[in-house]
Amino acid sequence: MKTAMGIVLSALLLACVAQDTQDKPATQDKEQAVRDFVAVRDLEELDKLRSSSNDSWQVIADEFIIYETRKADYLVEFTRACYALEDRTRIVADIRREMNIMRSRFDTIRGCRIRKIFALTEAEAAELKQLGESPGSRN
């Protein structure tokens, strides 16, 4: 009886470990796909962007968002995974040198330090938003 219980618990533990390792590559693959997109498209890296109270964002991967302003879209890369942006509250930079300017390497958004900011065209933003989605997954 104890041997059977030990085998069942071992199998359950292995199944949990296998599930955990299966989830991580998908996230890493999406982040790598965004990095490849930046390299292939040779996106222009910016030092700063002008923000306002009406700005919005869309999470692309754990370390990337598309920051949408009235005039332009930007790809923002964080120094680490930023889970604080998934609750969809209004985006506000935490630390700023200037009121309506967000700077890469210095400012943070909801505790996540901005590593890089890239300028995007409308077509590039649309392509990044669809990254990782299967055909027909949006209604």
Task: Give each language-model segment a name.
Residues 6-15:
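Bacterial N-terminal signal peptides
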Residues 12, 49-50, 113:
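Generic detector of short, well-ordered, non-transmembrane alpha-helical segments enriched
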Residues 1-4:
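Positively charged n-region of N-terminal signal peptides that target proteins for export
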Residues 8, 61, 121:
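Residues that line or immediately flank small-molecule/substrate-binding pockets and catalytic motifs
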Residues 78-139:
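Helix-rich interaction surfaces within compact, conserved domain-sized segments
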Residues 18-77, 133-136:
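N-terminal secretory signal peptides
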